[in-house]
Amino acid sequence: MNRTDLFKGYERLESQFELQGIDGMLTALAPVFDHPRGNTLKYTKALEGLPETIASIVDLDRDAPRVGVDSDLSFGQHQQLYQSLFQLCPWRKGPFEFFGIDLDAEWQSNIKWDRFAGRISALTHRRVLDIGSSNGYYMFRMASQKPRLVLGLEPQHTFYFQFHAVNQYAGQANLFALPIAFDAMPVTRGFFDTVFCMGVLYHRRSPLGMLRKIHDMMQIGGELVLENLVLESREDLCLFPEDRYAKMRNVFFIPSLKVMESWLKRAGFAEVSCIDISLTTPGEQRKTDWIQTESLDDFLDPRDRSRTVEGYPAPVRAVFTARAI
């Protein structure tokens, strides 16, 4: 499997969808995927090990998006599928169901989906960008609404290859993922109708700069769906962790609700609305057989679950919607 296999059909991003700059970007990525090494080679082999079959059913509009049923595969193919999927661990987002195999990911992402799915604009015929798309769980949930295009950006190769594993069987021709960070994405002014940015902004050293770039890539009147760590406060407060937050070194700014609204307005958005505030619990994020790393329980103070191990407030996430003006 090489670049040609991974990016098959991606020329449509320019030729059909008129998203400029993609062909040059794919050419620049060629050495990584044409001559894979390390984990990239490992994940390439995992994809090559997936059994070749056509799923008799594809049902993406459910908590665990489903491809195929048990009887679609022989016993040997089932073993082959399980081994290939397991080689792609850790699976952070899910759950999924592959031909009767229940893939219980670290995050029960359906919980987050249910918080906002009924409170945002319908995605039908829209051009959608998902920043930090991971393995595409939310992209596959979006697919049932028949968007014109969904483009995910995911620089972590683990999750990028997981997306291809799912879509090998889901066969969603209008879903695309690029293995790049948001910074590497050219500013396609006024292109996207809806942008999702979930669990990304607090990793940024310049959150306002990121919000401004998102704004510039959106149609006037387009909708931003933003999920972020927050402080449950209406004061002008922002937490800047001294070193780590919940054992994460790359967390920089955790704003209060009021500060988050101010950032969005300063970046050119209006009609800012906070549609959900939720404490992250072990029912939503926990260790499973499909990850080999720590999870939420390990990040909280064992003597006071309302604090992280560093002594900061435990993770609370809020979902905001806003309109580009």
Swiss-Prot record:
Superkingdom of origin organism: Bacteria
Keywords, sorted A to Z: Transferase, tRNA processing
Single GO BP term: tRNA wobble uridine modification
Record-level Gene Ontology MF annotations: transferase activity, transferring alkyl or aryl (other than methyl) groups
Binding positions (carboxy-S-adenosyl-L-methionine): 93, 107, 112, 132, 198, 202, 317
InterPro entries: CmoB, Mo5U34_MeTrfas-like, SAM-dependent_MTases_sf
Presence of keyword Membrane: no
Catalysed transformations (reactions): carboxy-S-adenosyl-L-methionine + 5-hydroxyuridine(34) in tRNA = 5-carboxymethoxyuridine(34) in tRNA + S-adenosyl-L-homocysteine + H(+)
EC number in record: 2.5.1.-
Cited function: Catalyzes carboxymethyl transfer from carboxy-S-adenosyl-L-methionine (Cx-SAM) to 5-hydroxyuridine (ho5U) to form 5-carboxymethoxyuridine (cmo5U) at position 34 in tRNAs.
Similarity annotation: Belongs to the class I-like SAM-binding methyltransferase superfamily. CmoB family.
Subunit structure, interactors included: Homotetramer.
Designated name of the protein: tRNA U34 carboxymethyltransferase
Record organism: Desulforapulum autotrophicum (strain ATCC 43914 / DSM 3382 / VKM B-1955 / HRM2) (Desulfobacterium autotrophicum)
